[in-house]
Amino acid sequence: MRIKMKIKISKKDFEKALAKIQGLSDKKGNIPILSNVLLEAKENIFKLTTTNLEVGATSKLPAYIEKEGYGLCNVIKLFQIIKNLSSSEIEIFSEENLVFIKTPNSEFKLAQANRDEFPTIEYPENFDIEFESHLLLNALKKVKPAVSKEDLGGFTLVGIYFN
């Protein structure tokens, strides 16, 4: 048994982060690796990453990291497990082919996907934008009526340009 990663984290924080990013994963299963979440532990930061190749999301959480490393497992299954746990602290560790979720009363195992197949999300350096969320929400409400809900072919606006 060779442990690749081992951490302890607050269930509440982990569940909240998973809830936010799990919606971006590929639920249709067209590309199976995109239904996974990349779990990375480094320097007391636990990072969760998902993508559907159009949009990617990363969430960073404080955690007690016993061994730095990574895990890669199905985000929906992981979220369902975490959501139903009663313990306030969770231990997560990964081995060659499995990701383990452990509490004092239970232990779950999820199949681990191949890290090399998961797409890398590259963020531009020094590209941080900070704003109050209500300002973005108000702006989106104004332009939403102009965005088509269906791709009708030809020239149809199905997105919003941010500048």
What do these predicted ranges mean?
Residues 1-163:
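Structural preference for solvent-exposed beta-strand-turn elements
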